[in-house]
Amino acid sequence: MGLPGSIVFLIMIHAFCAKKTPTNTLPSLLSLLGITDLPSLRLNILSLDGSANNQGSWVRDNTTFVYIGASSPANGVLFYMPTSHVQQMTFYKRPVSKLLASNNLIKFLNTGSYINHSFMTAMPPYRRNVQIPSDRSGLKLDDKDDAQPTGTNPPTELKNLKPIDVVNPEHRFILTSELTGTYVKHVCFVDPMDMLIPVDYAHIRTIIFGSDGAEVIMKIGITFASITISMKSAPPVELILSERARNISLIWPALKPYEPVDKFTRRPYLIYLLGPHMNASDMEIKSYINMIESVEESSNYDFQIAQTHAQLFIFAATPISDINDIYCFRVVTTRLFMSLVASVRNAFQSGYISFDEIIKTEANIKMITETLSTFALHSNPGTYFLLSGMHLRNENADIIKSLIRKTIINASKNTASLSILQHLYVLRSAYAFNISQESGNLGEHVSSISLELIIALHEESVRDTIAWNTSARHALYYAFASIFQRPPNEWDASRTARKALLFASSMCTEEHIVATELVIQEMYIKINVKNSPVHILDVYTPCVTALRMDISEHHHRLYAMSDVILHPVIEKYLENDSRGIDAEEELETKAELVITKLKTPLMRRLTIYASEVVTCSDADILEATALLVLPISGLGSYVVTRQLGIRGIVYNVDGVDVNNQLYITYVRLPCTTTAGNIVPMVLPRPLGSDCPYCGCVLLRYSTNGNLRHTIYISSQDLQRELIAGGNSSIRYFNPTIAQIYGTSLLLYPNGTIVRILAFESERVTIISATYVATATAGASIAISIAIITVRMRINNFRYNYHRYKKLSLYDDL
């Protein structure tokens, strides 16, 4: 399957079947497979019960598996075909059908013998040298106590839920029977790697995701589960969990039992690992052991999902290399797999599952798999795909979606009534169930709720009143994600997304970048020193969404280092690290890596939402030197770069270091290049309800060519603060605040740029009384010291002169 050899084999079979080849030509085909004993080719289509003792035949889901048990090069080969075709079949007359040859057959024919086969399923015995920890059932991602069902709030059916439960899902519990219905579906596990005899199991869900760099298949049941990880840059590997009562056998050598990794584990299931061990690298063996340890550590959902986020964070903080990517990708996907296994297992043991866990599970699957595709294995994020079958019956999944739709429609009419936490619940539900992508006005409603939250948090951000806590960070992530999840060709979708990008850039100030880097450093320490439970969104920042690319410039690192004294966790960590400044540099590098890796690649975001920038730019210059992109209107964008090369109205920024030059280009089709002139002016006060500055951006830069912030003026309230000057309550707009430095430009949506003189003149004239008093006292002291010094020198000169005169007189005598 997917190999050239299989194509050749299928063509030969198809030609043979199409001609309805007579009996006497059959041996020529069988001789190709090395089959001399014709009866050994068994086409038994009995039911499962009727052939339970015969592992040479299976019928599952309208498919018959045909096993070749002859002593031949094809020994142990498994074929499978539609049962309807098999039922019409006689041994000597086969109808035209799609007969699929297993990878085993093709590999076997290509390699010639089992001994030289490059993909052996055996692995050196694994034995733990440490004691297996017990389940850490008390571990949670937050400080809240887990809610439990009570007599007045028992587990219920999904049909009894109400829209209010979407904004308060933690206290609603669903019966486990709602996951599967009255009867659990039994299916046949056909090993994607074609190594194992098919296994019958109670199936709950299948998840397939990947990109052009990798593909992962997860199959999860009640007593059986498997994950197959395939990559372009590494051999595939498969992890299987099976109840102890079930034996796992290899297809070849014929029906040979496949030994579990460790028979003596205390877990209720056995662990099987399939992967190459001949010439396996240390990284391969290390990843195998880590995968096994992730199974043995705990069967608690909270622990496993916390470890998934921790490993994803470590992956993001790890320097890019093929070896690191392969290892980390396997570790993260295995942890995600184990969290799903734990969720299903716990639900069937307890008889219920919380409504919140159902929604969080779907959101985690999407967020984690999509994040992996953003930076792992040199993948193109545009090739990411996710095929996730829910662990709910279709009609029950529709009930949940209907609840979410009603909640969104109601919330869009009055977003002010929702708290940050309720925004989080609603937007996470919409994201998890792809509500933004549904037809009708639902996408517009979700975008409306998301944008209102972004506007509210932006207002708090510029006023320095925002609490960057867990709820705010998570809610903001899902708000942006829900907007970008909406198809861009829908009415108003692209305009909303461009506005969201402006808000993200406005919140990504110089101070916020520094604060976020320090928060990331603290999380890294928590994971590595304390092994505390974390969530990757605990360090989410608008800078991840913003089209600001100067995050890793050196001045941010210097500011972060100077603020370390305000973070005791980091300070203590560095004090205990003998590497000194190298340890601090390492933490800074990891923080920058996390932000950079979590960002959607610039060209992908621009291609979708700011195509005029891509059209009017040299791609190499854009990716190499762009510092900031502001899609300021529906048709045009500002691009700030270090080099010329963007076609549009080009402004050469004066007053900056010649070695760190800034160019601002207003880009709009048809990409006509002209020279712009930045005009200095005093902003006139608008009359009445006019809002001439609404939609503008206040950009501030320093004389060394560094961008400080880009504040989006989105409302009349912010316009009033802008023109209030020294009376403004927003420090970004108040020239009298001492720490404000640099030049301020106002960028208009039509491509006009002006330099605001108020900031420059105020910076010269506004001097604090404390500064004047200190300077005067210092000058007085300096003058006094100078006078005393001069007097001492004069006295010393006089004294020496008199001594000289006395000596002269003595010589004369």
Swiss-Prot record:
Leader sequence residues: 1-18
Intravirion face residues: 791-813
InterPro entries attached to this UniProt entry: Herpes_gH (IPR003493), Herpes_glycoH_C (IPR035305), Herpes_glycoH_C_sf (IPR038172)
Residues listed as glycosylation sites in the UniProt record: 62, 116, 247, 279, 410, 434, 469, 576, 727, 750
Post-translational modification: N-glycosylated, O-glycosylated, and sialylated.
Broad class of where this protein is predominantly found: virion
Virion surface topological domain residue ranges: 19-769
Transmembrane stretches, start-end: 770-790
Subcellular location: Virion membrane; Host cell membrane; Host endosome membrane
Membrane topology: Single-pass type I membrane protein
A GO BP entry: fusion of virus membrane with host plasma membrane
GO cellular-component term (any): virion membrane
Region (Interaction with gL): 212-273
Entry keyword set: Fusion of virus membrane with host cell membrane, Fusion of virus membrane with host membrane, Glycoprotein, Host cell membrane, Host endosome, Host membrane, Membrane, Sialic acid, Signal, Transmembrane, Transmembrane helix, Viral envelope protein, Viral penetration into host cytoplasm, Virion, Virus entry into host cell
Region (Disordered) residue spans: 135-159
Biased composition (Basic and acidic residues): 137-147
Family: Belongs to the herpesviridae glycoprotein H family.
Subunit (UniProt): Interacts with glycoprotein L (gL); this interaction is necessary for the correct processing and cell surface expression of gH. The heterodimer gH/gL seems to interact with gB trimers during fusion.
Role of this protein: The heterodimer glycoprotein H-glycoprotein L is required for the fusion of viral and plasma membranes leading to virus entry into the host cell. Following initial binding to host receptor, membrane fusion is mediated by the fusion machinery composed of gB and the heterodimer gH/gL. May also be involved in the fusion between the virion envelope and the outer nuclear membrane during virion morphogenesis.
Protein name as it appears in the record: Envelope glycoprotein H
Organism: Gallid herpesvirus 2 (strain RB-1b)
